[in-house]
Amino acid sequence: MSVANSRIAVYPGTFDPITNGHIDLVNRAAPLFERVVVGVAYSPSKGPALPLERRVELAQEALAAHANVEVRGFDTLLAHFVRDMGAGVLLRGLRAVSDFEYEFQMASMNRHLIPEVETLFLTPAEQYSFISSSLVREIARLGGDVSGFVPASVVDALRQVRESRAQV
């Protein structure tokens, strides 16, 4: 078991896809920590639009400006991933009060599983507070413009998904 280091934070999620809200959170967290690991969860039960490898690539492209940010995919229990990374902080984003109940429950469970790790909540800048990956996927699936919510590489990836499904 690794020793928890409070200068290392893990920011987990499915990032299906990564949004400008996620990027904003990492942009604000990166100066606070020696290292931020963006953990891209496999999450097959969520039926992701993009495969894990592609979600990792898109996150790496979007966050490449940060020398202290690393993007890694994982398919294990989050508590195990956090320990493997040696992190002492688990970062979570709160967009609205509606996120709080779920996030509070998750933080409580994680406190039991990894008591040496603190959960830290960050809120996005106001202009990103309404963006969610699920809304972005739905807008893209229906042919809407998501360019204001995600990086250009994600717009292209979602367009490719839509086109490939249209051919089936």
Curated annotation (Swiss-Prot):
Known EC number: 2.7.7.3
Molecular function GO labels: ATP binding; pantetheine-phosphate adenylyltransferase activity
Residues annotated to bind substrate: 14, 46, 78, 92
Localization per Swiss-Prot or TrEMBL: Cytoplasm
Amino-acid positions noted as binding ATP in the UniProt annotation, renumbered to this chain: 14-15, 22, 93-95, 103, 128-134
Function of the protein: Reversibly transfers an adenylyl group from ATP to 4'-phosphopantetheine, yielding dephospho-CoA (dPCoA) and pyrophosphate.
Oligomer status and interactors: Homohexamer.
Family in the record: Belongs to the bacterial CoaD family.
Protein name (record): Phosphopantetheine adenylyltransferase
Species this chain originates from: Xanthomonas campestris pv. campestris (strain B100)
